[in-house]
């Protein structure tokens, strides 16, 4: 089956095998995030439930290794006309939240900001306006720091809201800038590992300060960790 109880150990093992230092998650609920944290004690996470700003509903959580990164600041805002509290924006079907963290890389001494989100699966206007909102938030950040934006954008690489980010002059899809790309499939599998698609709906955007050595869409598990494929 595809239940969380069956998938959770393989999610944790996949993460630990690849030794991700920092990563964004989507659709995780509080108990699922706590399960992962218990199985991966080397990680901490930040984020809130989208429904109440506490523990209710899905998170757009960011996991990180405190051994590698120091969390300097963090926050959350909603993908809506009112970013300050849980509410649906524009024509969205669901409440959507974005979590961000400001991190110090203890190895390099560099500081950066990581935004992580899950855009609406129905609202066309909501997705485009969410992309514009993210760019506004980046521009309004009090310090000009390198930026990472990860998430489930619910659109592929040809869609308007993707192109708003890709052509912004602020961010670029890591797929397009990496020295090496390992992507033998798209990122949506609907729990069917043999499904093939050219569509990438999960993206990692980076500001120009980042040098991308490798980009990968990981399919290396017999049991699908999720209905979308890990993007690194």
Task: Report each predicted region and the residues it spans.
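Extracellular/periplasmic catalytic domains that process cell-envelope and extracellular macromolecules
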Residues: 16-17, 38-39, 53-56, 91-95, ...
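Metal-dependent phosphoester/phosphodiester hydrolase catalytic core
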Residues: 93-95, 105-128, 132, 141
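Structured beta-strand-rich core segments of catalytic domains in phosphoester-bond hydrolases
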Residues: 22-111, 214-218
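Active-site-proximal beta-strand/loop segments in catalytic clefts of secreted hydrolases
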Residues: 1, 26-29, 48-51, 65-66, ...
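Metal-dependent phosphoester-hydrolase catalytic domains
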Residues: 125, 129, 138-147, 155-232
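Glycine-rich, highly charged phosphate/nucleotide-binding loops
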Residues: 2-14
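Active-site beta-strand/loop signature of hydrolases that rely on acidic residues for catalysis
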Residues: 11-36, 63, 101, 111-117, ...
């Amino acid at each position: 089956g595809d239940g969380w109880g069956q998938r959770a150990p393989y999610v944790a093992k996949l993460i630990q095998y690849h030794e991700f230092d920092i990563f964004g998650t989507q659709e995780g609920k509080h108990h699922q995030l706590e399960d992962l944290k218990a199985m991966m004690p080397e990680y901490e996470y930040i984020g809130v439930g989208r429904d109440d700003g506490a523990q209710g509903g899905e998170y757009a959580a960011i996991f990180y290794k405190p051994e590698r990164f120091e969390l300097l600041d963090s926050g959350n805002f909603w993908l809506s006309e009112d970013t300050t509290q849980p509410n649906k924006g524009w024509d969205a079907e669901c409440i959507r939240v974005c979590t961000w963290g400001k991190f110090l890389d203890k190895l390099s001494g560099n500081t950066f900001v990581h935004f992580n989100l899950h855009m609406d699966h129905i609202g066309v206007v909501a997705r485009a306006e969410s992309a514009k909102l993210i760019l506004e938030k980046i521009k309004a950040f009090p310090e000009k720091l390198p930026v990472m934006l990860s998430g489930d954008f619910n659109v592929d690489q040809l869609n308007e809201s993707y192109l708003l980010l890709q052509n912004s002059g602020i961010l670029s899809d890591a797929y397009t800038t990496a020295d090496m790309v390992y992507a033998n499939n798209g990122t949506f599998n609907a729990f069917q590992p043999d499904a093939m698609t050219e569509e990438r709906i999960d993206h990692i955007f980076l500001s120009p300060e980042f040098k991308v050595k490798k980009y990968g869409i990981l399919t290396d598990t017999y049991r699908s960790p999720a209905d979308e494929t890990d993007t690194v």
